[in-house]
Amino acid sequence: MASYSLVESNSFGSENWCLKLQPSYKHGLLTGLSNGEIRLLDWSTGKSVQKIKASETAINDMKVIGSDFSAGHLVSSASIDAVKVFDIRTNDRIAQIQNEANSPFISLDSRHGLLACGTELQGIDAAVYIYDIRKWDTPLRSLIDSHHDDVTCIKFHPSDVNILLSGSTDGYTNIYDLKQDEEEDALHQVINYASIHSCGWLSPKRIFTLSHMETFAIHELNDKSDELKEPQPLDFGDVREIWNCDYVVDIYPGLIATGKTQENCGELCLLPFKDEKVDTENGIVIPHAHGDEVVRDIFIPAQHSNMLYSCGEDGCVKIWENKQGPLDIPENFWDYSKKMNVLGDDDREGSINLDEPLIIQKESVSTRPRKEKHKKAKKHSMKSRFKPY
């Protein structure tokens, strides 16, 4: 079992939770705080070198535009009032996005020249808005009928510009084919699992779902054939006992981060994760990483995988070093530079230029008839450790 030692610890106040980490390798490590600030941290010391006041309320989500971690200089933040985009180099706000329902924004993702924003439930609407990052005034697409509760997680397919994933507290994880103009047609697949804390792509056609109840499963992406061939998911069930944890931080390339919060027994654990198998025998435990408080996010730099950055509800960002050397983990779940057509339908064949957004359907001035959303009898409960968002 490898061991980590603490290199640096920087506190932003015990009542000021550190909720998210995003790398901007050229500028520093970004963290989003519950007081509405984004801080840019020095890679070596973890000290704040820049402050962006993004909101008066918590940073619910934060994403480097385009997922351009090597050279990117734009960062987006989601809060109750708006999604805002800032230039790290100048601190200038270059865009502010709001929606007609004034719904709080709680989730973000950005790839392929696009930014997707998910909202809380407002009335009967919980929406996903997709923007061309060259034109912030009007969304390219609004998906307003596919979720009926908070949209907690959004992920573009890293290799297919036309595929989007969204997860919600309504229990559904939706996969959209953005080549389809009508939302009903664009809703390619619905995974009915549980209230979603996190979801994403493990491989080009494999999807993970992590729930607020600490259940975990892996699902197959359906193709477009007339016969439904979706296999049963690989369902791990409630992982707290089998992974010896109280909660799962998130799923990362090559590892799963878990935590414990019992009094005087708090810890962060890194479980090796490869080929959809979790190695519980060789987990790396950092005792009392953030005291007994919840760890919200971790980050391991691709070129310095002996280093680990963590942030949590104790208000701290901490830097750790693995004394036994770099971890053998990939930077991404697969090689994202390979362009793919994961649904394999004929009308999508050909060269896809990821520099040009391919979402054709733009917002219409006219109001189309509303379609019925899929319904669930009961909203899944959420655990307090996931607030604020």
UniProtKB/Swiss-Prot annotation:
**Which SMART domains does the annotation name?**
WD40 (SM00320)
**Ranges occupied by WD repeats:** 11-53, 146-186, 289-330
Q: Where is this region: Disordered?
A: 361-389
Q: Which residues carry this modification: Phosphoserine?
A: 351
Keyword 4Fe-4S included in the entry's annotation: no
| Keyword terms of this UniProt record | Phosphoprotein, Repeat, WD repeat
* Basic residues bias: start-end ranges: 368-389
Q: Which GO terms describe its cellular component?
A: cytosol; nucleus
Q: Known InterPro entries for this protein?
A: WD40/YVTN_repeat-like_dom_sf (IPR015943), WD40_repeat_dom_sf (IPR036322), WD40_rpt (IPR001680), WDR89 (IPR039328)
Another remark in the UniProt entry says: Present with 3970 molecules/cell in log phase SD medium.
Q: Which PANTHER family match?
A: WD REPEAT-CONTAINING PROTEIN 89 (PTHR22889:SF0)
Q: What is this protein called?
A: Uncharacterized WD repeat-containing protein YNL035C
Upper classification of the source organism reads: Eukaryota, Fungi, Dikarya, Ascomycota, Saccharomycotina
